[in-house]
Amino acid sequence: MTLRFPRFSQGLAQDPTTRRIWFGIATAHDFESHDDITEERLYQNIFASHFGQLAIIFLWTSGNLFHVAWQGNFESWIQDPLHVRPIAHAIWDPHFGQPAVEAFTRGGAIGPVNIAYSGVYQWWYTIGLRTNGDLYTGALFLLLLSAISLIASWLHLQPKWKPSVSWFKNAESRLNHHLSGLFGVSSLAWTGHLVHVAIPGSRGEYVRWNNFLEVLPYPQGLGPLFMGQWNLYAQNPDSSNHLFGTSQGAGTAILTLLGGFHPQTQSLWLTDIAHHHLAIAFLFLVAGHMYRTNFGIGHSIKDLLEAHIPPGGRLGRGHKGLYDTINNSLHFQLGLALASLGVITSLVAQHMYSLPAYAFIAQDFTTQAALYTHHQYIAGFIMTGAFAHGAIFFIRDYNPEQNEDNVLARMLDHKEAITSHLSWASLFLGFHTLGLYVHNDVMLAFGTPEKQILIEPIFAQWIQSAHGKTSYGFDVLLSSTNSPAFNAGRSIWLPGWLNAINENSNSLFLTIGPGDFLVHHAIALGLHTTTLILVKGALDARGSKLMPDKKDFGYSFPCDGPGRGGTCDISAWDAFYLAVFWMLNTIGWVTFYWHWKHITLWQGNVSQFNESSTYLMGWLRDYLWLNSSQLINGYNPFGMNSLSVWAWMFLFGHLVWATGFMFLISWRGYWQELIETLAWAHERTPLANLIRWKDKPVALSIVQARLVGLVHFSVGYIFTYAAFLIASTSGKFG
């Protein structure tokens, strides 16, 4: 018999229907379920695939550098970052007529180009790159790293180089290596790059390999380090009239604590950033020496966890048994990693706009909007994935005997209390927030806007005041000149910080009012509901009231209606599926809020947001409808313009999104009948009946159809909003 796809499952390979193809694709990466898999091969396959992942990342970033160097305008952008539009790459399209060629020829290019809204120009400029030659060098270096990663991937699948299971389960060594070796050393290396290359570059000094050893990053070199006079490195910082990239107004300090932003670039001081990375490096280098390995010093994580027993005996056995549970479950480890990474990605979104690290990126409004939205969506998908793998852990890896009465077992014992509290919080937030919005809508509709219920977010304003924002008049902590906190930081970072937080042109601690209060609670509703669905799905994954133990049922059985006893309540896969809709919904509200608030800030009409955001019609009319005018005008009676591609994508995104419903609201029997009718017609049509297929066509399973629907819904939703965001922002600000 010839070997058919999928090779990893003989059972599936012999399936006579098209199910073989779909199930093969669905389980291709589920190594645990493959024929002849052993624990050792499982770990080795995943380890090797990590190097493949790195190779793809390096290749992709190399491509970014290469295309900007080849087709971009990096060198002319550097001369005037605020007015030259950065080019991502050229467009080669044989369908372009003269109007299209003219519309897309911009940024000083000779032909049609795409504008870069990714912030790479600002990033590369900040870290000291200055010429196309630098970009080509970077591209080649990353290409080399990509090749090395691929070789490493292949090498670690060869018999001599395959690591053993015990090597993979040596948690202490891995933690030490990752903390010290990856985070610590790389942060130290990055500090070195900033001090030796980026900071001199920002002061007009071009440091490369040929003069790297001759140019002192600091006049006295390492003298102050060895003499213990570290404060010298902070003396004589760049002045407030420093022109970035030149020696005008430049200082000599390399590690500072100035606080606030560089007045010209509106980004954090490079010397502050270098100082931050040095501190991070120190912390992680220390942290990476905490755990006991071959040398017999440091802590054993197992001993630490076993000792974590709550006193008094009423809270169970604490962390007993957790070490082996986590160390033997890849899904548990992946869940923890995804949860951490998801939070970090969302924090990146928040901090990239409020504390911009890259020169001039704060004045590139479209890039700011694109980066915020991008990182929030990525965070949403990663965080839902954390709970999916948490659920799979309970089904495949959880052993009740090993975890008796510890925190995991007790969490399962209390799951009704956990889910009911989350449910109550979600209902409370939902009804109250919607009630306020709808009340305000009705008042506006009846012409009595003064009867709206408008609530000032006084607690949030108090927190902002504590951080130094003076406009609310709270006079507390950093906003009070008499407080000890104020006096403690007055001589170092505080003046710069206070200047930044009270400056109305940046995004640091934006002024908030009743509209913010409402949308904050709408977002809280979305977050709590998403969390409720995900937490319930994970906690009920192994067993719930209807089905006490689902271990043999697996993860992805469908919610199948009342016909089979009602499995809607108890499918972990279905909880994940539902949660993704809520996640997208929530991030929609988050990005709408961020974007509208910033558009009004950038245009200087914040009163529009303040007045229109307190009722739903305001959001629909003054944010969505008003800002979609650019998309509707991509093609108009005067021809086309550079927004037409976004207008097209806006329509296309809606189409993909709507197609999702064809799969989501459907009955499987209908599809099966339709397929068989089509197959019957095909077989009875001359010429067409010459083509036969080996697999009998069958309708998608319930879970598959849901997945296909969810993918269309998600992709369409994101495409639609991406087009709206970029067109409405770039149409206003260029």
Swiss-Prot record:
Positions bound to [4Fe-4S] cluster: 559, 568
Record EC number: 1.97.1.12
Membrane topology designation: Multi-pass membrane protein
Catalytic activity: reduced [plastocyanin] + hnu + oxidized [2Fe-2S]-[ferredoxin] = oxidized [plastocyanin] + reduced [2Fe-2S]-[ferredoxin]
Any GO BP: photosynthesis
Record GO cellular component, one term: chloroplast thylakoid membrane
Matches recorded under InterPro entries: PSI_PsaA/B, PSI_PsaA/B_CS, PSI_PsaA/B_sf, PSI_PsaB
An example Gene Ontology molecular-function term: 4 iron, 4 sulfur cluster binding
EC class name: oxidoreductase
Residues engaged in binding phylloquinone: 671
Localization (cell): Plastid, Chloroplast thylakoid membrane
Gene3D superfamilies with a match to the protein in the record: Photosystem I PsaA/PsaB
Keyword Nucleotide-binding: no
UniProt keyword list: 4Fe-4S, Chlorophyll, Chloroplast, Chromophore, Electron transport, Iron, Iron-sulfur, Magnesium, Membrane, Metal-binding, Oxidoreductase, Photosynthesis, Photosystem I, Plastid, Thylakoid, Transmembrane, Transmembrane helix, Transport
Cofactor binding note of this UniProt entry: P700 is a chlorophyll a/chlorophyll a' dimer, A0 is one or more chlorophyll a, A1 is one or both phylloquinones and FX is a shared 4Fe-4S iron-sulfur center.
Binding site for chlorophyll a B1: 654
Xref: Pfam families: PsaA_PsaB
Family indicated by similarity: Belongs to the PsaA/PsaB family.
Oligomer status and interactors: The PsaA/B heterodimer binds the P700 chlorophyll special pair and subsequent electron acceptors. PSI consists of a core antenna complex that captures photons, and an electron transfer chain that converts photonic excitation into a charge separation. The eukaryotic PSI reaction center is composed of at least 11 subunits.
Job of this protein: PsaA and PsaB bind P700, the primary electron donor of photosystem I (PSI), as well as the electron acceptors A0, A1 and FX. PSI is a plastocyanin-ferredoxin oxidoreductase, converting photonic excitation into a charge separation, which transfers an electron from the donor P700 chlorophyll pair to the spectroscopically characterized acceptors A0, A1, FX, FA and FB in turn. Oxidized P700 is reduced on the lumenal side of the thylakoid membrane by plastocyanin.
Protein name per UniProt: Photosystem I P700 chlorophyll a apoprotein A2
